[in-house]
Amino acid sequence: MKEFLLLLAGFLLAHIPGVFDRKRKLKTHWHAIRAEMILSKEKVETLLSARIPAPLYRLPVVAYSTSFPILLAEGAVTEDEVMKIGRCFGQMQDINRGLDYASEMYKLGNNEKLEKEHERNCLKANALLFGEDGEESLFEPAKKIIDSKISVSWWRY
């Protein structure tokens, strides 16, 4: 019996660091996504206020592309959370495509299409930050989810 208890204790001690490491990694992924959201919000606000039709910057989406699949595989998000976060980052990626297109129009010297693309990008940016047609912002619900995931106590993951 003594040997069994020692074996069981050894087994438990061997797996405890892995559990804590998993929780630390999940929280780190959430922090990376939140940092990216904050940076994106700053850039979207600049896009709306600066009136530069083809800026050189793009909204960062690397952490989302890298970390979110890991969080999905770990079962760290619900379907509703996936939808809200996905809509937010999908809009960010749409804005990036619009900025790429505006940059091409700038290179070609097509000011008419450049201005139209800038207007579209501003509409997308407004929808991201403030919502459209009476709907809520895409940014705030996603940020609330991410903030709630970060604030979860380490033993609850």
Feature annotation, model-predicted:
Residues F20-I38, E42:
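Juxtamembrane membrane-water interface segments immediately C-terminal to a transmembrane helix
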Residues A35-Y157:
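Interfacial alpha-helical end/capping and short helix-turn segments at domain and membrane boundaries
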Residues A14, D21, T28, A73-A76, ...:
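Primarily heptad-repeat coiled-coil rod domains in cytosolic scaffolding/tethering proteins
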Residues M1-K23:
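Membrane-embedded hydrophobic alpha-helical segments
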Residues H15, H29-H31, H118:
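Histidine (H) residue identity feature
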